């Protein structure tokens, strides 16, 4: 089975955790677009945003998406990759898009437990809970529009991985 899986969702949804599990179980290569950007630019995302702005970061994100897309890969995308209509279309045309959907409170709780959450610049300058509520309000429709499958990210990473494998092996693509 030769496929490309794109995992989308907000920060804290579990894209990297689930992506690594899936890649391991499928013998695919795991790629995180944020890590790819950091490696190719030799800068942190915070530094890119602080020095060049969000617009430049979004352009780098779009370039990274196309650079890393290859068969037999699980690609964990940055939370804002769906802001570009071209990116949404590209992912739908080139693979299966899995949206890990989680509530703002769950996302905020997970982000507060991650040390790297302090390294990412705030999009709004508000508390993590308020920011995640605003981000989801602005992006939920875009995530849903892009996704072939929407999965409850409140489930354990192992259950999500099992569910995605069942979808893949059943040949269901919506």
From Swiss-Prot:
One cellular component term from this protein's GO annotations in UniProt: cytosol
SUPFAM superfamilies reported in the protein's UniProt record: P-loop containing nucleoside triphosphate hydrolases
GO BP: any one term: aromatic amino acid family biosynthetic process
PROSITE patterns: SHIKIMATE_KINASE
Reaction(s) catalysed by this chain's protein: shikimate + ATP = 3-phosphoshikimate + ADP + H(+)
InterPro entries: P-loop_NTPase, Shikimate/glucono_kinase, Shikimate_kinase/TSH1, Shikimate_kinase_2, Shikimate_kinase_CS
Location within or outside the cell: Cytoplasm
A matching Pfam family: SKI
Complexes and interactors: Monomer.
Annotated family: Belongs to the shikimate kinase family. AroL subfamily.
Domain notes from UniProt: The LID domain closes over the active site upon ATP binding.
PANTHER family assigned to the protein according to its UniProt record, in alphabetical order: SHIKIMATE KINASE, SHIKIMATE KINASE 2
Protein name per the record: Shikimate kinase 2
Naturally occurring in which organism (per UniProt): Photorhabdus laumondii subsp. laumondii (strain DSM 15139 / CIP 105565 / TT01)
């Amino acid at each position: 089975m030769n496929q490309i899986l794109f995992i989308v969702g907000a920060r804290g949804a579990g894209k990297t955790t689930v992506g690594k599990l899936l890649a391991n179980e499928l013998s695919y290569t795991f790629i995180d677009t944020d890590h790819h950007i950091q490696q190719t630019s030799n800068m942190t995302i915070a530094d890119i945003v602080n020095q060049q702005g969000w617009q430049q970061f979004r352009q780098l994100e779009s370039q990274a998406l196309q650079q890393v897309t290859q068969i037999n890969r699980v690609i964990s995308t940055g939370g804002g990759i769906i802001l570009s209509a071209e990116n949404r279309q590209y992912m739908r045309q080139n693979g299966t898009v899995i949206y890990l959907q989680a509530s703002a409170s769950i996302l905020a709780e997970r982000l507060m437990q991650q040390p790297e959450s302090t390294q990412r610049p705030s999009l709004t300058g508000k508390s993590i809970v308020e920011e995640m509520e605003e981000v989801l309000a602005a992006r939920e429709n875009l995530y849903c529009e892009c996704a072939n499958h929407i999965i409850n990210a409140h489930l354990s990473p192992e259950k999500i991985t099992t569910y995605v494998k069942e979808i893949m092996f059943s040949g269901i693509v919506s």
